[in-house]
A protein has these predicted regions:
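Active-site acidic/histidine proton-transfer and metal-coordination neighborhood
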Residues: 65-172
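Conserved, mostly hydrophobic/aromatic
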Residues: 12, 21-23, 46, 86, ...
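Glycine-rich, proline-tolerant flexible connector loops at the mouths of alpha/beta enzymes
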Residues: 24-40
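Short, acidic/polar
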Residues: 2-15, 42, 74-84
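Structural motif
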Residues: 15-16, 89
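Active-site beta-loop-alpha junctions enriched in small/polar residues
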Residues: 1-3, 23-28, 58-61, 98-101
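Structural preference for beta-strand elements that scaffold enzyme active sites
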Residues: 19-22, 50-55, 92-95
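An N-terminal, globular interaction/scaffold subdomain
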Residues: 35-54, 58, 75
Length: 172
């Protein structure tokens, strides 16, 4: 849940047996420390709607950490401070994703199932049709925080990062 979601917390809280909500602070740049005011405002809104505030969807991991750049020490310290602040606010679970560049990949957010319900889905064939640098690079859920020039530069930086190097950078 976020304040800009089409389904408002007022409606989510009306779902039978709904006890908690997964949310995040969305107005702070990746790598920066989330303000206690933002965290507490999110907690207040959640609790006011009768929901538990115990799970955060993501504290994004800055690309400089994944790439092993010199700025990673400051960014890791900021990440740790976010974890401390969330713990102080009562958060027990922080979901994270260390996937380079796009955070997560789905090709559709509403794949129709046999029973008429919908779910998130990934189809490699759909993904392979896209060219994120020279053509279309929008997939459901991507925040599109990179301009094409920035994306091209980031892809070039990752060309020199093997799977082992990425894991070394994450273990650092």
């Amino acid at each position: 849940y976020g304040p800009d979601d089409p389904v408002k917390i007022e409606y989510i809280s009306q779902i039978p047996n709904m006890k908690s909500i997964v949310t995040a602070v969305y107005d702070t740049p990746v790598g920066e420390v989330w303000s206690e005011e933002s965290i507490n405002a999110l907690k207040k809104t959640t609790l006011e709607h009768g929901l538990e505030f115990s799970v955060i969807e993501s504290v994004p991991v800055h690309e400089d950490i994944k790439l092993g750049k010199p700025s990673r020490d400051r960014l890791i310290a900021n990440y740790c401070e976010n974890v401390r602040r969330l713990g102080k606010a009562g958060v027990k679970v922080i979901c994270y994703n260390f996937m380079p560049v796009f955070d997560w990949t789905r090709t559709t957010l509403a794949k129709k199932r046999k029973d008429g319900s919908t779910c998130l889905a990934y189809d490699k064939k759909d993904l392979l049709k896209m060219d994120p640098i020279n053509g279309e690079f929008s997939l459901p859920g991507w925040d599109e925080s990179y301009e094409k020039d920035e994306l091209k530069k980031l892809f070039a930086e990752y060309e020199n990062v093997s799977e082992d190097k990425l894991f070394d950078n994450l273990k650092y």
